[in-house]
Amino acid sequence: MRKILFLVVFLGLGLAQSEGAKVYSANCQTCHQANGQGLPGAFPPLTHLDKVVQAKGGRAYLIRVVLYGLQGPLTVGGKTFNGVMPPFRQLKDREVAAVLNHVLAVFAKSKAKPFTPEEVKAQRARAFSPQKALKSRPPVK
């Protein structure tokens, strides 16, 4: 009986979603899809973000994207996307950090240090438009 109880608890914990996964599912998945591959011609994939986060200014840029959205042409993997990503300023600082950590770990397979709520708070204190957020994107190869 004890083994069965342990197995049920263990499996239940394994199925529990992280906060980042929950935020992604509720706010990002519709456009970027459950697998982070996006929709061709409409919404870019998120699998390349390790290159972005490693670039100078990349961490701040990714936070700005979530907080302020994006508007204007964006080239990812040789393909241009020209849509609008809405801002998600309603998310708490810890939720923004969690969703970025989820995306980087799961889709980009990044080993970048985790984002913190303090980093998000620092970017939230600055005013950016979706167009200005896009212009702050670091060059990536």
Regions of interest found by a model, annotated:
Residues 1-4:
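Positively charged n-region of N-terminal signal peptides that target proteins for export
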Residues 24-34, 85, 99-102:
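The canonical Cys-X-X-Cys-His
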Residues 10-24, 38-39, 50-54, 134-135:
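Electrostatic cytochrome c docking/interface patches
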Residues 19-24, 58, 62, 95-96, ...:
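Stable alpha-helical elements in mature extracytoplasmic
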Residues 38-75, 82-91:
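Gly/Gly-Pro-rich "capping" loops immediately C-terminal to redox-active cysteine motifs
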Residues 76-77, 83, 88-141:
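Flexible coil segments in periplasmic/lumen-exposed cytochrome c-class electron-transfer proteins
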Residues 17, 39, 59, 92-96, ...:
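Solvent-exposed, acidic/flexible segments
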